[in-house]
Amino acid sequence: MSDDVALPLEFTDAAANKVKSLIADEDNPNLKLRVYITGGGCSGFQYGFTFDDQVNEGDMTIEKQGVGLVVDPMSLQYLVGGSVDYTEGLEGSRFIVTNPNAKSTCGCGSSFSI
């Protein structure tokens, strides 16, 4: 998708830079970061991240800086208006989701409720 179109999910520069670095380490330019939601965690739903070289029918791909973020349609409905970012701090480094649809989140930020 083009940067000129309003996207339902933001893929930040920091996240795209980290994905680009990790893909270079794997030496597989076809890899994309997939964000998904599953049941579980202390708040009912949890975020997951994996690298995937497949884009399934119905998936949304957001391109930034030559790398892609892929989201399946079921997960996307819970992520609309949110962002995928990458942070480094005292707690370590990780991809994080900021989700305005979450009614509550757990302390670690990896699970949420709607």
Swiss-Prot record:
InterPro entries reported in the protein's UniProt record:
FeS_biogenesis, FeS_cluster_insertion, FeS_cluster_insertion_CS, FeS_cluster_insertion_RrpA, HesB-like_dom_sf
Q: Quick check: keyword ATP-binding in the entry? A: no
Q: What happens when the gene is disrupted?
A: Reduced amounts of quinones.
For whether the record's keyword set contains Iron-sulfur, the answer is yes
Q: What outcome follows a substitution of C42S?
A: Does not complement knockout
Cofactor binding, per record: Binds 1 iron-sulfur cluster per subunit. A study found 40-50% as [2Fe-2S] clusters, 15-25% as [4Fe-4S] clusters and the rest as paramagnetic iron.
Q: Which domain of life is it from?
A: Bacteria
Q: Which GO terms describe its molecular function?
A: 2 iron, 2 sulfur cluster binding; 4 iron, 4 sulfur cluster binding; iron ion binding
The consequence of C108S is: Does not complement knockout
Which spans are transmembrane here? Answer: none
Q: Name one GO cellular component term.
A: cytosol
How does the annotation summarize its subunit structure?
Homodimer.
Q: Which family does it belong to?
A: Belongs to the HesB/IscA family.
The UniProt entry, under HAMAP family, shows: Fe_S_insert_ErpA
The cross-references to NCBIfam families, in alphabetical order and at most eight, read:
iron-sulfur cluster assembly accessory protein, PRK13623.1
Name of the protein this chain belongs to: Iron-sulfur cluster insertion protein ErpA
Q: Which organism is it from?
A: Escherichia coli (strain K12)
Gene of this entry: erpA
